[in-house]
Regions:
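N-terminal Rossmann-like NAD(P)+-binding domain of SDR-like oxidoreductases, especially those catalyzing
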Residues: 1-184
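C-terminal substrate-binding subdomain of Rossmann-fold SDR/epimerase-dehydratase oxidoreductases
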Residues: 28, 208-298
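Residue-level signal for the nucleotide or nucleotide-sugar donor/cofactor binding architecture
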Residues: 42, 66, 94, 102-105, ...
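A conserved pocket-lining segment of Rossmann-fold NAD(P)-dependent short-chain dehydrogenase/reductase
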Residues: 92-93, 173, 178, 182-193, ...
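Active-site loop immediately N-terminal to the catalytic Tyr-X3-Lys motif
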Residues: 96, 147, 193-194, 243
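Short beta-loop-alpha junction of Rossmann-like oxidoreductase domains
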Residues: 133-135, 189-191, 287
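Short glycine/proline- and charge-enriched loop/turn segments
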Residues: 137-146, 187, 199, 278, ...
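Hydrophobic alpha-helix immediately C-terminal to the catalytic Tyr-X-X-X-Lys motif of short-chain
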Residues: 157, 161, 165, 200, ...
Length: 298
């Protein structure tokens, strides 16, 4: 899609990936960026710079994806939609019913509102959680869905709804294009790291700032693909620009980093004399997840 003069709705725009996507979108000659957010996880501080631009506004009537009529109203006149709103991994673990209503039914509501309003393109925020533990590394997009947690299940459902409704309305006046992005382990500025399983980089830095050692659960052999949120924002804007449709892409570096190596790297960079503190337990949903970025790079 040509972005010049276009209007975009960013659902979940006050969150980590959403706010960085807005920052990148503002570098384009777009006409309007409308933010639809309930500010449950996101906050206006994340939007401080973006809101200085007159092209950016927060939709004032609400920001819940479960409110179908308000969501549809927010989508009127939009050319494209970025959909980031979702309950995070641990909330899905603790509250699966709410996760179903927000992540699955909410995504259906987004798609339904797009069809009603003839919005032409969607960038859907999926997740590497659809893969679960890697059967083979690096994981390509045709890697089997090895997921065993409810968050991953909601993202698989979201992908399949995008595909099903795309094919239902193709070659009609309600047709739309979409792409889904499967982010690897995202880190960076504005990250909310209250959850026990996320934001390991920020938690290590936070401990060091407090004079505490970095904590690593188990032996630290868990390995992930870490991607900076700025790169995720760039990927989202590129996905909106692209001609590709009805497809999913990994967003990662393809670099395998163990938690032990990561902690040692941070200690070296910060010139800290702290030693890694190994602890048993800790909630770990996957132990190895490294994506292949080749398809997205093309």
């Amino acid at each position: 899609m040509e972005l010049k003069g276009k209007r975009f709705l960013v659902i979940g725009g006050a969150g980590l990936i959403g706010s960085h996507t807005i920052d990148q979108l503002l570098k384009e000659d777009v006409a309007e960026i409308r933010i639809y957010d309930n500010f449950c996880r996101g906050n206006e501080e994340n939007l401080a710079n973006a809101l200085k631009d007159q092209r950016v506004n927060i939709f004032e009537l609400g920001g819940e994806v479960i409110h179908r009529d308000i969501l549809s109203t927010a989508m009127k006149g939009m050319d494209g939609v970025f959909h980031f709103a979702a309950l995070w991994l641990l909330h899905c673990w603790e509250y699966p019913r709410s996760a179903f209503e927000v992540n699955i039914a909410g995504t259906f509501n987004v798609l339904e509102a797009m069809v009603e309003n003839r919005v032409k393109r969607l960038v859907y925020s999926s997740s590497a959680s659809v893969y679960g533990n890697a059967v083979e590394e690096p994981m390509q997009e045709d890697h089997p869905f090895n997921n065993t947690n409810f968050y991953g299940a909601t993202k698989i459902a979201g992908e399949q709804m995008c595909r099903a409704l795309y094919h239902r309305y193709i070659n009609t006046d309600r047709s739309f294009d979409y792409v889904g992005l499967r982010y690897m382990n995202v880190y960076g500025a504005r990250q909310d790291y209250r959850g026990a399983y996320i934001a390991v980089i920020m938690k290590i830095l936070d401990n060091l700032e407090k004079g505490k050692p970095p904590i690593v659960y188990g032996d630290g052999s868990q390995a992930y693909d870490f991607i900076n949120v700025i790169d995720c924002g760039l990927a989202n804007v590129s996905a909106m620009k692209a001609n590709a449709s009805d497809s999913f892409y990994n967003v990662g570096t393809g670099v395998r980093t163990t938690i032990k190596d990561l902690a040692e790297m941070i200690l070296e960079i910060t010139e800290s004399r702290m030693k890694i503190q190994y602890e048993s337990g800790g909630m770990t949903f996957v132990k190895n997840r490294i994506g292949c970025p080749a398809k997205a790079e093309k």
